[in-house]
């Protein structure tokens, strides 16, 4: 592994081509249009075109799609010299993950007569699973090669589908916006991976692990898109009608309350009482994570705002006090602070969901109970039992995520060349790191590695 | 007020927390899901899911949401050293305003049995009201603290709701896209505030009150999003069916015509015949403002294009000739030129609306008259009277906006530190203003203030 | 033409105003609301509001709109000193083209009783035609004045409408996403224009014909938006129901497969095995172009992925090996490489469409055949004949595009001042090219021109 770039020339194309060819073969063998996308099937029955699920979900799908590719992609461009890697590797692993997720999710809970049926709902679910992988990417940002990222994605998507299957299909857990399945899972999986890949000499790349003025503005593009479209994210696969409507509304208020909490906490904890861009870029989003489970329930705007408010506070405190401890004591180098944005708020969201579920009554939900808690509506379990199932699901998710993160093992770029686009990308000349310097560093590293 | 930042550490958190806690308590006491978001209510009656208002309005809502947070936020990033403040304070006051607006608008015209009902329409209305506050923010950009901005937002939202109540509920004025209620109101309110806060020594910050190459590109993100989604803005709360469709179409053509007028006028008025980014970023949007009232009417594409064309011309002329006079003679320092983008085009839009209303006939509108002019359709007034009501509404809006702007009073950052992120934000080191210099300036200011 | 800017002061306003006034007059004489946007017409019949085409197509329209103004606009900002021109001229010619296209397309295939009917479908079609013009703009980027661009747009829109009329109306060709009508047409038209405008001394502007770090990030905004919303582009005007749904799905998978192929090919062909931003920004989109014709057909996800995979490979190979040859041997200076992104993938898309059409059977399409191949469904031609028509359409498109590009002739900025915003835009002082230097260059050029 004398030269990082030379090995890329061989390995990356091989990995990309082999993965894509496998995907194509499996799609050829297993994937079919579902009832609503198939010309013959759809026209076989009589109904109106506006009943096609496309019109209920496609606008939400596109909002989710923007969150995955622009939201996550640009949120991570805050690093001064890792903008190409942030948005570019995000693009690569997302494009891979959504294909692989279609297969894995289809395999575990979408088979119909030996075939995986696809349509707008499977597209949303694949994007959701991809979101989880991108959360983990945030934890290891700047310290991994694209090949490692693709490997990680392959494992993580698989385990995501397993966890999702256990929760949604076996246990009947409700988690429409994925506080558990997406955020908690992605965060703790990523934290475990970054722990295993601990780099004792990462401080050698410390000067690059920070932002410049314009990179912070690029990151704000990601933040704002995530913030705006989170109501679509949480409501994208809830039941039609009041459910989608209510989930969007709850998320909207949770995020608004979270934002005020974030600004207040940022000023109170920061140096000199100034606002810290890291908090604004991340903690203001915690409100969306924290109503991912309970958003479809009758949480009320009041309840949503309380949850969002708490999520903002917890998240800023995490950035200020917990992250340094995680790094120094537990050797967890969490580049984007996903523990503060997705980890803790995800756990909070799971708990809120469990409590809200346990308190559900027919008096509040009426016939709408069938949409939100079908098992409670048909009398097979009672509400408090549903709450217990929700709580159990959190534990299972944490277990699978942490164990799953342990599985992934591999080789990585030297500590001196982290957070640096020049390793994997052609960088415009004027801004490229001094070639000589780069070479020197490489040589040193090579010596170390080969010694 | 010796040190701006120290006072932020105390005041901003206190203000944020108190405001949010008050909001949460009021939401708990007053706010309820409406018929279409409530699980029990919606399921109590028989209807198809696609009849839920969510599917008629949510895509438009998301477009409006993008205009508020990305559109306004990035439009103002043109300042070279105030990008964090532009997008960051925009974020803060918008998140506050939309919550406060839900309460105020609900209080004035959304109470049902002592409760404020919320759903996608209230979300759009709250975003609309927020837009008005952000217009005013444009007038004072770079010269106010976040606490002042929150105070301004609190007053402005309240008065916005009062004005809206008088127009829409008492008088039966039509103003779906808010030429009067949003743009005229926001602009003249903001101009009055910036007049009261007149800074005689603002030329000390003159070198920062300008753009750099990349800040102009960031601002174009805001411009283009506002331009693209304006058809959704104007049509978001018009009646279902032909009304939403027609409004979007009219706005689309008005904006296209406005853009050509803007480029032509920019070249003719600018130094050396070159195009001026300030014009492109702002005047090209005036066409959307100017069909805010008449867009839902049978204005025809032809009429819409004439209105857009005029709006573009007026707006560029305003930037070139009127803004300097307003500053030098009337002491109105309008940072973003909101008078040219929202003020004059808003007044034009109100006049166009009044004339178009006065000319409405059953021959043109048919049974569609019920949607656009219900009072004319049921015979309680005739079209010319509706035109009169529209004109009166403009006068009322101007009066309330200007008087309202007078109410807001407070203390502000020193003239030497305007348009500077370093006052309120942690700025990445390499780009921070020289610490010594900042300190010196502060000390001087402190001396002045305490003397 | 002694001074470029002086002539702009006169010519650009005159051109903009005359064009817009002509447009307004023609709209006044010819354009009418269609059935679904007209208050009287829509209310004359009984139907539900959700049957209005607005709800089937407006969200797709807005996605297409974003692709046209943000997608194309920002994709071209990769040039270090031509960001204003990229996004600003894109804005100008798009705003003109969509109005002119409404007239031309209406004239050729939208007349009803002597009037052109407009609604959401005409808006989408106008945006599509605009897209074609912007593709041609990509070929000549940085080397043409705004007046030339408007002239080119005027001719190109007209010929686009002629070609579209021949294909869709006369021959019954299927091309919902425009592999032929939009991409192939726009690319070869633009390549012919740039060939005629060949600049032997363009290497004098060579140092500006490249990117800087942040300009590449701005370009990624354009890329990602194009990528995300391409499913909406291809499905925007297909039949309601399964057709829109299926087209979006096929495009989604084609793009994902294309992205992996692009990353692999970029690493294998680039210097040192590093990824090249030019490939990522462009080739990853070829998958959307290549399913523009067959996307609405029963191509299956499997077929879509194969097409996308091939498109990505072809596109990167084009950038690496074909573009340099086109420039050195054929004197085609293709600034954005539109031949690789739109030309070859467009031709591939046409071929895939012809083959897929030829293979269509009732067994696969059932009653859905009426939506996709109405002429095959009603028995007037058989599937293999439809395939032949598709192939013929490609030849016609290539012919009209290449001949059309020959027509456009004009005068242009000097070779030394290409790719430079300072010629047409007020550039913030600190970054403006040294005034003296600019003057010197101008003087030299003037001498040459006048000699």
UniProtKB/Swiss-Prot annotation, chains A, B, C:
Carbohydrate attachment residues: 44
Entries under InterPro entries matching the protein: Ammonium/urea_transptr, NH4_transpt_AmtB-like_dom, RhesusRHD
Record GO cellular component, one term: basolateral plasma membrane
Annotated GO MF terms: ammonium channel activity
Localization, UniProt: Basolateral cell membrane; Cytoplasmic vesicle membrane
Segments traversing the membrane: 12-32, 64-84, 88-108, 122-142, 152-172, 177-197, 217-237, 248-270, 275-295, 299-319, 341-361, 391-411
Intervals, Cytoplasmic compartment: 1-11, 85-87, 143-151, 198-216, 271-274, 320-340, 412-451
Membrane topology: Multi-pass membrane protein
Gene3D superfamilies recorded: Ammonium transporter AmtB like domains
Domain of life: Eukaryota
Keyword Acyltransferase carried by entry: no
Disulfide bonds: none
Keyword Nucleotidyltransferase among record annotations: no
Family designation: Belongs to the ammonium transporter (TC 2.A.49) family. Rh subfamily.
Job of this protein: Functions as an ammonia transporter. May play a role in the elimination of ammonia in the gill.
Protein name, UniProt field: Ammonium transporter Rh type B
Organism of origin: Tetraodon nigroviridis
